[in-house]
């Protein structure tokens, strides 16, 4: 397997527990853009997962998805950052097992997982690395299992948003991107590795940014927009993939 090469940004510069503490569940959270963005993504991904599914959450960060959404405590989270894995183990250790990437062996999990989730990773790794991990995911999935993958939909609007976030966001990701996918490019990458795309949908509209001003109403507008256009337009690509 190729050794995953990622910058020091992911290992040490992202604060411990950053993504988990950015996701809020109180009344004020309806007006928090970042929190709403992540919760909409997690909810969309979780709609593909059954309560008894054993899940591998690859690039799990600080463990929020397993800790807040996945029901089966036999699930596993893996990440390249020791800081995030330590945080996840401390906070969500009762909801799953968490491993630093160098301590996780794919070979021990042949045909093991009902679902594998990989959320927001592929844009930060090379296509060679992506293809290598797709092969590993295929090995670890049960015969009827599914890989659920998300990545930004890098069309004009998303590129503009990323530019703005690089200037005004809490973290600047602009130097971390290695590949910018659209749905066609992602589809071809997946098929190239002997996997099959069951479904591609695009989630999260620009209405999400209005949540700062109109809170819950913005989330309703985002939901209506998705239904109206059957999730054919959105800032995030969500792919359901099988062997």
What is each model feature region?
Residues 1-111, 115-117, 134:
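Conserved N-terminal segment of class I S-adenosyl-L-methionine
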Residues 26, 118, 167-171:
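Short amphipathic alpha-helical segments at helix-loop
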Residues 31, 126-136, 146-239:
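S-adenosyl-L-methionine-dependent methyltransferase catalytic module, highlighting the catalytic core
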Residues 50, 125-126, 141-143:
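Helix-to-beta-strand junctions that scaffold the AdoMet/dcAdoMet cofactor pocket
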Residues 54, 145-146:
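Short glycine-centered segments of the SAM/dcSAM-binding site in methyltransferase folds
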Residues 120-124:
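Short catalytic micro-motifs in class I SAM-dependent methyltransferases
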Residues 241-243:
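Active-site beta-strand termini and strand-to-loop segments that position acidic
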């Amino acid at each position: 397997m190729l050794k995953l090469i990622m910058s020091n940004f992911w290992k040490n510069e992202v604060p411990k527990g950053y993504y988990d503490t950015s996701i809020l569940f109180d009344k004020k959270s309806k007006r928090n853009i970042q929190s709403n963005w992540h919760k909409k993504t997690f909810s969309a991904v979780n709609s593909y997962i059954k309560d008894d599914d054993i899940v591998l959450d690859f690039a799990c960060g600080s463990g929020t998805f397993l800790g807040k959404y996945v029901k089966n405590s036999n699930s596993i989270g893996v990440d390249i950052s020791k800081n995030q894995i330590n945080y996840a183990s401390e906070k969500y250790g009762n909801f799953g097992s968490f491993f630093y990437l160098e301590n996780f062996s794919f070979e021990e999990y042949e045909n093991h997982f009902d679902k594998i989730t990989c959320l927001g990773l592929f844009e930060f790794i090379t296509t060679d690395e992506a293809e290598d991990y797709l092969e590993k995911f295929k090995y670890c999935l049960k015969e009827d299992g599914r890989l659920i993958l998300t990545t930004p939909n890098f069309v004009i609007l998303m590129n503009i948003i990323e530019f703005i976030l690089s200037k005004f966001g809490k973290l600047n990701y602009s130097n971390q991107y290695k590949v910018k996918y659209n749905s066609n490019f992602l589809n071809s990458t997946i098929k190239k590795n002997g996997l099959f795309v069951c479904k591609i949908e695009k989630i999260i509209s620009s209405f999400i940014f209005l949540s700062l001003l109109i809170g819950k109403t913005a989330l309703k507008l985002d939901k209506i927009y998705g239904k109206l256009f059957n999730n054919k337009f959105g800032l995030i690509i969500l792919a359901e993939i099988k062997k």
